[in-house]
């Protein structure tokens, strides 16, 4: 997903 933007928030589910 959007690494660095929402690090850990959504666990990179994209």
Curated annotation (Swiss-Prot):
Keywords associated with the record: ATP-binding, Calvin cycle, Kinase, Nucleotide-binding, Transferase
E.C. number: 2.7.1.19
Protein's pathway: Carbohydrate biosynthesis; Calvin cycle
Disulfide bonds: none
Gene Ontology BP terms: reductive pentose-phosphate cycle
Assembly information from the UniProt record: Heterodimer of a 40 kDa and a 41 kDa subunit.
The name this protein goes by in its record: Phosphoribulokinase, 40 kDa subunit
């Amino acid at each position: 997903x959007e690494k660095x933007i929402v690090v850990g928030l959504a666990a990179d589910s994209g």
